[in-house]
């Protein structure tokens, strides 16, 4: 059973009490609504795995079971708040397009859908059975008819509710001050990102603004006067923590589709036409492709299949109209699947398995022979292996687009550059040895190639003012495909260039490759000739046959002075070439040797750092792909908001740095860019997944230390721990990972410091797995195939080491309390917090590491939250717990005695300093851009909010109040 990763528990979901509820009136009574604000995780001192923390609309905050001990205390009422949407579905009652939240489809009527609100308000025939879709990807769940079922009134923060500021309030005095009330006038979505996730509130002073009620898991409001929000059928809502199964798209022969699969449509035209109704539609031209081989390009949100037949033709098909074609032939490029256990199982009777084949897992190879039994001989990494066809998938080049493999883009451009340079060198040699009549029309080009300025001048003087049209001497006549001006410019013969310009030689005439004279000065690295041509009015942005400008050429060849001159003369630094690469893309591809050029280009005022090339890489993506640290810093300085921007496949800059082992780039993105280390791509992989997948041992500790979750799962339910044991279980740790990479040594030192015996003998996969287990990775976490890391650790020594590391983590989390793993524990975040699930008894506290000073000491117990995080010395000055932010009412030593707060230094001087510091911070906050948090506000919008000039120029709506920006006023502070 495959589970839909989008249907799992996420912060922001709106919930009501469920079938296993036993917590009295904590929710304010049956029908009360709350918001999931925190998820449990294995080993957490706050909440264990399969529990959640809920902030109820009426104010109480506590934890509940979402699969823990097999119980489900809550039901999911609405998931529009986490961005769930059915893009191509229209509610047939309220007619809203792009249905948000759960979808309810009638099983009796053809193509009839309702949104949650309409379904719960008894729209459509109550005797009809419906299907529930939690997401656009999940399998439908069949429901009984609504007729006769009890409906429960919904109460909470809805239109008309009376509210005050809530637990996540961070909006100053917008409400008029603590305790002031407001009235909810509307529940809406946050732009196009989420639905029904914010409330529009009008306060007592008449001001209106929007506040979070589920958006990003935050709740800015607390309900003091509930409003009715409709009804719900308790029996028809899904249990929170029980994700829906993934909807499988299958072909006509019952096999599930994947991107890159080879398919054919083998149906008659009439049958296909009927099937296409509601599945992409019918076009008569589709009949031309019946029986032709195509490639699955993508699966649409509705489950239809987008098939590409050639470079330009794509059609959308009903999945049942297609048949998969699984054959491979000699010459086909394939990829070996990466799951070690799966390959071992499939190889039985098909060439068998040997441990020497391990390096081929996940690699790309070519089919060199097809055996009679269907097995294939595949060349991978210089060796040949026999594989079962089930172990291979068709290679999709776009999969490697995020890998800096063999510097593909740079090699292609360098090869083209070398080709042009070589042909030009051959042409010059031919010109210099050419014996021609002195009156030959191309003689002027020969003299330019020989550098005979005097002879060229003599030829020009012989026909004054007629050189441009004299039959015996045409100044723009080509010889070997070049004009005299192009040759002179390439060789840097400035005097001859001036003479030819005086003779009205054309500056715009291209050669056979489309290069103008300015391209030739760039190819020849001739700064002075470039100046002369630009002063004479030469087109600075002329493009050749590959759509490259002279700036592209100069950048690709690394000619800094020419680049400077072109930029000074106002060339367009944003023009893309045939690959949609800008000059800065090319400079980044050139590596560290072009750092000075990167400096020059990024200082040009009009440069567009958001430019994207044909592979979907922005400049920040490209710099992260290539490991260009300087470029990353320069781009972040101009547009830090791009740090988490995603490509079409969901890859961010940090994904690319992690995938390609660019540790320093990752450090810059984390520390200077403040990127989201837990961001996930379309396959739900985090940067940690990719670093582990590629065995980049230096990046794994960096990402974990930066806060990357070790228990995040990808689309297959695999955590980083699963990946480590699947991909690199057989690779030796040091022998194969040496060569100047400090990563293995860093990771080894961390393992040795933990006291793990024999860690130097571990393989790469085992070492990474042990490190992750030490950092809290759940060794019992089951993926969608039901396999845990302990199941994948087939070797007894590795299994024992993994269990030992997990035990060390539990002991560390318990504060050295004898290694008893902590039970469910609640995060007490507000005065209204109640704890449902209590910690099992543990041994008395022993010396542990203080989270502030890192000294080993007896930790102080905070009340009411019951956290032990810091030593006595650090605890004296604390007002709030640093783990849960609850105000501390009492601080207790292990013996039960109370810690007295630090003595305040009396006297006006200290109070004055604190007051001035507070005022300074307030002033700084008022004038700092709320987007980049780096620059001062320079632009003010009509709503009163503002931003710095670079951020403000790119905005269409105010980031604070979401009002459209009609005017920008520049200020000086």
Swiss-Prot record:
A zinc finger (ZZ-type) spans 86-138. This is E3 ubiquitin-protein ligase MIB2. It is found in: Cytoplasm; Endosome. The modification Phosphoserine is found at residue 251. The gene is Mib2. The keyword Phosphoprotein applies. Ubiquitinated. Possibly via autoubiquitination. ANK repeats lie at residues 480-509, 513-542, 546-575, 579-611, 615-644, 649-679, 683-712, 716-744, 785-814. A zinc finger (RING-type) spans 850-885, 929-962. It catalyses: S-ubiquitinyl-[E2 ubiquitin-conjugating enzyme]-L-cysteine + [acceptor protein]-L-lysine = [E2 ubiquitin-conjugating enzyme]-L-cysteine + N(6)-ubiquitinyl-[acceptor protein]-L-lysine. Highly expressed in brain, heart, liver and kidney. Keywords: Actin-binding, ANK repeat, Cytoplasm, Endosome, Metal-binding, Notch signaling pathway, Phosphoprotein, Repeat, Transferase, Ubl conjugation, Ubl conjugation pathway, Zinc, Zinc-finger. One of its GO terms (biological process) is protein ubiquitination.
